[in-house]
């Protein structure tokens, strides 16, 4: 995924995804797990600066549920990752199936 003009940002995200499994394997001997969460568009204080029309537009682009993600939904995934010891070395997209348009 990546939008026009955001090659460096997209590459940095790809780097995180690409190193998740090797780091999980490396740290396994110490009993550590490594997971990556790739969030979609979540409500944050930064978004509070946007006009409501822009927020509605962003939320409507999410296939389902058609809204912005909420912090408690992110936290729920973190709790699930912690609770399940078999989750290791994986990236989970938490994004309501959104893929940003090229521009």
Model-predicted regions and their roles:
Residues 9, 17:
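Catalytic tyrosine of NAD(P)H-dependent dehydrogenase/reductases that use a Tyr as the general acid/base
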Residues 70-94, 99:
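C-terminal substrate-recognition "lid" of short-chain dehydrogenase/reductases
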Residues 25-29:
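Alpha-helical segment proximal to the catalytic Tyr-Lys
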Residues 53-73:
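Catalytic Tyr-x(3-8)-Lys segment
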Residues 4-8, 31:
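Conserved catalytic loop/helix region of short-chain dehydrogenase/reductase
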Residues 38-49:
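Short, flexible catalytic-loop segment of classical short-chain dehydrogenase/reductase
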Residues 12, 20:
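Active-site helix of classical SDR
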Residues 30, 35, 90:
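Rossmann-like NAD(H)/NADP(H) cofactor-binding core
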């Amino acid at each position: 995924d990546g939008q026009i003009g955001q090659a460096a940002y997209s590459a940095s995200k790809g780097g995180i995804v690409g190193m998740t499994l090797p780091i999980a394997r490396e740290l396994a001997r110490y009993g550590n797990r490594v997971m990556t969460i790739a969030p979609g568009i979540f409500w944050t204080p930064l978004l509070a600066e946007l006009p409501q029309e822009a927020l509605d537009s962003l939320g409507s682009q999410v296939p389902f549920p058609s809204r912005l993600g909420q912090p408690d939904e992110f936290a729920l995934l973190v709790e699930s990752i912690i609770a399940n010891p078999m989750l290791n070395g994986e990236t989970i997209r938490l994004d309501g199936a959104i893929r940003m348009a090229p521009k």
